[in-house]
């Protein structure tokens, strides 16, 4: 469905909940505002009694994961167009070319992307350019899009502070994304 500045947040939310994608043709900043409004609606607590009270922690976790999946599916329904050069052909469209090139590679034809996904690309690009401060390293890491967050402190601090076996001289960081865990281990003298 085509959506523009006349589409209300309530109507957009109903459509998104039904699985209807909305291709935005209005003002880009209004699309961002609509995404925020959709998120607010998706984050509302269910009515009392609407969900079965979980009997175990595992059930509570499963309910949480299902709710997060539904939220993600709803927010992914708002789409924006990109031209062949990763330009957003909407009024007040943000410059996303460098972010898209870094994450997606060269584009040769027009395409469509979820606004939420596009904003994630832009956020990752800003991290790549400016870096993310990792206190355990006393330095910045410049991660690529789609890798382990270098600022997930609970993991980084654990690797930085946990006692290591005395004979440990070599470790493998399997699945290295940003390399932050390998850098923390290297700082501790591990090869």
Segments predicted by a language model, with ranges:
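Conserved SAM/SAH cofactor-binding pocket of Class I
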Residues: 152-191
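N-terminal auxiliary segments of SAM/dcSAM-dependent transferases
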Residues: 1-132
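A generic structural signal for short
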Residues: 7-8, 148, 169-170
């Amino acid at each position: 469905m085509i959506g523009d500045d006349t589409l209300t947040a309530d109507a957009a939310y109903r459509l998104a909940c039904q699985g209807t994608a909305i291709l935005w043709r209005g003002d880009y900043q209004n699309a961002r505002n609509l995404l925020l409004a959709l998120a607010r609606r998706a984050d509302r607590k269910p009515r009392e009694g609407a969900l079965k009270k979980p009997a175990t922690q595992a059930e509570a976790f499963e309910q949480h994961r299902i709710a997060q999946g539904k939220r993600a599916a709803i927010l992914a329904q708002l789409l924006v167009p990109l031209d062949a050069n990763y330009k957003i052909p909407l009024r007040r469209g943000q410059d996303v070319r460098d972010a898209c090139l870094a994450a997606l590679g060269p584009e040769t034809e027009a395409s469509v992307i979820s606004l939420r996904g596009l904003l994630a690309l832009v956020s990752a690009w800003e991290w790549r350019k400016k870096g993310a401060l990792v206190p355990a390293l006393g330095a910045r890491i410049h991660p690529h899009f789609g890798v382990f967050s270098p600022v997930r402190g609970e993991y980084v601090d654990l690797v930085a502070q946990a006692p290591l076996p005395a004979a440990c001289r070599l470790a493998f960081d399997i699945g290295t994304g940003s390399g932050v865990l390998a850098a923390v281990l290297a700082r501790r003298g591990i090869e």
